[in-house]
């Protein structure tokens, strides 16, 4: 008889090194086949039957997302929902499904294509929570790296799916937060400084020499540095793109202020990120590159605003790592 395992994240008081454990509830599949998601014997959907607090998300909606991901697109080992929706260390500032999907082999689809798949399968108009912030990582990477991002997801996250062949285990010991803090702080100090220096050079080129080409190029490059800094401080690894449009799409839910600064609402018509991308491509080599000073000034001001937002975000995250290191 096929069975389902429903996972519930509960406090564990008997082991100080393992604050969480997974409670397994075995349910006869014949008694639970009214939900289409439960048709697959490999799926384990978190329906937490014993959670007293009000949920911040709809389990049926989470199950629908998992079903879409596993319906011929991916063969994951497991999928975790982490962050504030499950009462864990906050990740996204916006209300979003922070999901970590771990796969054994590099999949055909990357996170950008997967967002499109989910948009087709679970349209925004049908979602109670609009945003899905999905990370796709290989099992080999997860098993060979210790970062705060991976620790928070695995220690606090809710297991939405686990393959029949994989035995999911939570970390028994915390990572070395002192090392994580030092590493993130070094990256923050190095690349934030470079970003700020580029902003100063951009302002000098704009105000003093009236060189719009250099002002545009330096502003765009500064934004790339700031986004790389933000990604590393939160995730403990380098981001694999220098495209400011892609970088914002990857990190936008980390701060609603960033979303307000750069998201195009089709009312305000905020095109700063595509313009920054074009600055990077055209200002170094395009002989006909030109931009009106008034328009460039608007884009530069948004970059300065984003720099302050990112610096504040990184500062708060670094404080968290430092506080956790002092408790060890």
Describe each model-derived feature in a short phrase.
Residues 77-81:
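Short, hydrophobic-rich beta-strand element in sensory/regulatory alpha-beta domains
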Residues 93-99:
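Short acidic, glycine/proline-enriched helix-loop-strand junctions
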């Amino acid at each position: 008889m096929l069975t389902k395992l429903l996972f519930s994240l509960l406090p564990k008081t008997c082991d100080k090194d393992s604050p969480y454990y997974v409670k397994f509830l075995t349910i006869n599949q014949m008694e639970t086949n009214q939900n289409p998601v439960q048709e697959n014997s490999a799926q384990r959907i978190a329906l937490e039957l014993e959670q007293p607090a009000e949920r911040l998300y709809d389990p049926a909606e989470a199950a629908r997302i998992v079903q879409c991901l596993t319906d011929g697109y991916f063969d994951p080992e497991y999928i975790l929902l982490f962050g504030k929706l499950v009462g864990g260390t906050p990740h996204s500032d916006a209300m979003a499904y922070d999901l970590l999907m771990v796969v054994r082999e590099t999949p055909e689809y990357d996170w950008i294509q997967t967002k499109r798949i989910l948009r087709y399968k679970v349209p925004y108009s049908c979602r109670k929570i609009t945003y899905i912030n999905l990370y796709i990582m290989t099992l080999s990477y997860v098993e060979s790296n210790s970062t705060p991002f991976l620790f928070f997801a695995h220690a606090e996250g809710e297991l939405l799916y686990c393959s029949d062949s994989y035995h999911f285990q939570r970390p028994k010991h915390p990572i070395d937060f002192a090392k994580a803090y030092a590493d993130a702080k070094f990256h923050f100090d190095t690349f934030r400084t470079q970003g700020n220096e580029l902003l100063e050079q951009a302002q000098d080129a704009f105000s003093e020499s009236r060189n719009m080409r250099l002002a545009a190029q330096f502003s765009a490059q500064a934004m790339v540095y700031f986004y790389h800094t933000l990604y590393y401080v939160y995730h403990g690894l380098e981001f694999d793109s220098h495209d400011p449009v892609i970088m914002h799409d990857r990190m936008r839910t980390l701060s609603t202020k960033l979303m307000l600064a750069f998201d195009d609402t089709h009312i305000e018509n905020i095109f700063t990120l595509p313009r920054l991308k074009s600055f990077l491509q055209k200002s170094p080599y395009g002989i006909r590159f030109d931009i009106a000073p008034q328009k460039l000034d608007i884009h530069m001001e948004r970059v300065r605003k984003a720099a302050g937002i990112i610096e504040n975000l990184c500062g708060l995250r670094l404080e968290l790592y430092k506080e956790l290191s002092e408790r060890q």
